[in-house]
Amino acid sequence: MKNYHDIVLALAGVCQSAKLVHQLATESRADSETFLTALNSLFITQPQRIEDVFGGEVRHLKLGLETLIHQLNAQGDQNLTRYWLSLLALEGKLSKNPDAKQTLGNRISRLKEQEIHYARDSEIMLSIMANIYSDIISPLGKKIHILGSPDYLRQELVQNKIRAVLLAGIRSAVLWKQMGGTKWQILFFRRKLLATAKQIYSSIY
């Protein structure tokens, strides 16, 4: 039997990354706590439970749950829809590419070693995360076209933040697949996903 609670949490993680990308592209900034939650998820590779990936508490996925609920209600921004569905598609490509998976694992291991020297949200670490996305994930499929302010999107720091958040989105997409998530559920069990997302969201308050 599918654990829709965990499937929804992982999918909320994907949607949260999509929302952060939108914020960065249109405003050049994102909610700091939510941004850190995304980055931190890259360092949690052996969680005891799914909440551990997102700071141990469901409240850290509040923005992602809000976004997911809007998306499942067909009230969401079309760009956000494209972002999170593209992340799921890229995860599908990654799962079928053993070499890319191994390289990604090795690069994430080296990333974790760097936090001895640098803060996770430092410009150096963001650059490393962005390079991992560009080197391994981006070549797997169609590149995600990000829409926003050209002035912001030209800034290297904003570019690196966006790619780092996209990498975190891939982390959540991998988790979603591991929890039993499928695209068929999004098509045929939308009401079940929506009801579960609303139930989890209501528990935050």
Swiss-Prot record:
Q: Name one GO cellular component term.
A: plasma membrane
Q: Which InterPro entries match?
A: HflD, HflD-like_sf
Tell me the keywords, alphabetical order. Cell inner membrane, Cell membrane, Cytoplasm, Membrane
Give the domain of life.
Answer: Bacteria
Q: Which Pfam families match?
A: DUF489
Q: How does it sit in the membrane?
A: Peripheral membrane protein
Detail the disulphide connectivity of this chain as listed in its UniProt entry.
Answer: none
Which compartments is it annotated to reside in? Cytoplasm; Cell inner membrane
Looking up SUPFAM superfamilies in the UniProt record yields: YcfC-like
Database matches in PANTHER family: HIGH FREQUENCY LYSOGENIZATION PROTEIN HFLD
Report the family membership.
Belongs to the HflD family.
Identification of the protein by name: High frequency lysogenization protein HflD homolog
Question: Which organism is the protein's source?
Answer: Haemophilus influenzae (strain PittGG)
